[in-house]
């Protein structure tokens, strides 16, 4: 059996805490009371997923995720809540997402034994900005933009494998979203589920149940590093 040589990481939700980041940015931009920002952020994220699902259903290929988030924000905000400039500024916060506390130390340990790369639906420019700002020590950055399709389309996983020069069995997908892992597993990739109970904030509906269908189930990146011998 081939030995895993590279790890691919989902970024939004798995490596970064978008919920807290966006809520804090929204309150900074609009300190006035009366807006339930946690609810807005949850519906905003759901609107993003709905837009990607619609794009896949209509075979529209890749769309700028920044533009998708910007449009989805207008859909969830009432008229008069934030100016156009403020909405533009808040959308840019998706490029300033903070990592979960375990991420940098966990990646640092994993990097001693594996090639580390992103495999994200977000734009390449956003990945670069997030990673540089947060000090995320990737060896490579792969994104849907490079494949022209969004996860879970098989083409995006194959694209990453081609760029890495590795067989699927030599690569492990790491994500907190099970649809992502199942798509990778169907192509022969290894899988590691990382539970993020606060992905949608306290009381959010994150799926954190471990499953035997995945090769590894971990509580965070440090636990993942421990289980992978780093």
Give the role of each language-model region.
Residues 62-70, 82-118, 128, 154:
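Short, acidic loop-to-helix structural element flanking the phosphoryl-transfer center
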Residues 1-5, 104, 108, 119-230:
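Asp-based, Mg2+/Mn2+-dependent phosphohydrolase catalytic module
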Residues 1-46, 79:
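Active-site neighborhood of HAD-like aspartate-dependent phosphohydrolases
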Residues 10-13, 73, 118:
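Generic structural signal for small/hydrophobic residues in well-ordered secondary structure
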Residues 21-28, 43, 71-75, 89, ...:
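Alpha-helical elements of Rossmann-like donor-binding domains used by nucleotide-donor carbohydrate transfer enzymes
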Residues 22-26, 30, 44-49, 69-70, ...:
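Hydrophobic alpha-helical core bundles mediating ligand binding, dimerization, or RNAP-core interactions
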Residues 47, 112-113, 137:
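Structured helix-beta-strand junction loops
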């Amino acid at each position: 059996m081939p030995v895993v040589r590279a790890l691919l990481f989902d970024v939004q939700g798995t490596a970064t805490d978008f919920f807290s980041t966006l809520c804090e940015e929204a309150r900074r931009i609009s300190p006035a009371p009366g807006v339930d920002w946690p609810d807005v952020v949850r519906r905003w994220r759901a609107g993003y997923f709905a837009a990607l699902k619609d794009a896949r259903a209509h075979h529209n290929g890749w769309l700028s995720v920044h533009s998708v988030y910007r449009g989805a924000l207008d859909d969830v905000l009432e008229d008069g809540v934030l100016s156009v400039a403020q909405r533009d500024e808040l959308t840019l916060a998706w490029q300033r997402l903070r990592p979960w506390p375990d991420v940098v130390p966990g990646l640092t340990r994993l990097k001693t034994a594996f090639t580390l790369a992103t495999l994200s639906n977000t734009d390449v420019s956003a990945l670069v900005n997030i990673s540089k700002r947060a000090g995320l020590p990737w060896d490579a950055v792969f994104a849907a933009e490079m494949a022209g399709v969004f996860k879970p389309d098989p083409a995006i996983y194959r694209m990453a494998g081609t760029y890495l020069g590795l067989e699927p069995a030599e690569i492990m997908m790491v994500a907190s979203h099970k649809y992502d892992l199942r798509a990778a597993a169907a192509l022969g990739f290894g899988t590691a589920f990382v539970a993020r109970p606060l992905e949608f904030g306290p009381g959010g509906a994150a799926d954190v149940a471990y499953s035997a269908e995945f090769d590894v189930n971990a509580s965070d990146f440090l636990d993942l590093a421990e289980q992978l011998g780093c």
